[in-house]
């Protein structure tokens, strides 16, 4: 028999919210869950991700130390 009044309250239909919209309902110890990033607004999944070009850093290093690349 479990001890009484030591277990958290269980909410079986706690809504998961993002930007004011309900995404889904799950079981939780909190009555409502708020998420900032999810599948619908993450840059990787929405194809709005930008790539960082680091080629300039290598060129600056080679120039700074007077090294020749294979192309030169």
From Swiss-Prot:
Keyword annotations from UniProtKB, A to Z: Chloroplast, Plastid, Ribonucleoprotein, Ribosomal protein, RNA-binding, rRNA-binding
Name of the protein this chain belongs to: Large ribosomal subunit protein bL31c
Organism per entry: Thalassiosira pseudonana (Marine diatom)
Pfam families: Ribosomal_L31
Keyword presence, Magnesium: no
Lineage per the UniProt record: Eukaryota, Sar, Stramenopiles, Ochrophyta, Bacillariophyta
Annotated family: Belongs to the bacterial ribosomal protein bL31 family. Type A subfamily.
Gene: rpl31
Quaternary structure note: Part of the 50S ribosomal subunit.
Chain's role: Binds the 23S rRNA.
GO molecular function (one): structural constituent of ribosome
Swiss-Prot/TrEMBL GO biological process terms: translation
Keyword RNA-binding: yes
Top-rank taxon, per record: Eukaryota
Cellular location(s): Plastid, Chloroplast
Alphabetized InterPro entries for the sequence: Ribosomal_bL28/bL31-like_sf, Ribosomal_bL31, Ribosomal_bL31_sf
Gene Ontology CC annotations of this record: chloroplast; ribonucleoprotein complex; ribosome
């Amino acid at each position: 028999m479990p001890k009484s009044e030591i277990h958290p309250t269980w909410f079986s239909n706690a809504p998961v919210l993002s930007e004011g919209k309900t995404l889904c309902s799950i079981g939780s110890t909190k009555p409502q869950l708020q998420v900032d990033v999810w599948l619908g607004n993450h840059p990787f999944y929405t194809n709005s991700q930008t790539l960082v070009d680091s080629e300039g850093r290598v060129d600056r290093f080679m120039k700074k130390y007077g090294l020749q690349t294979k192309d030169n």
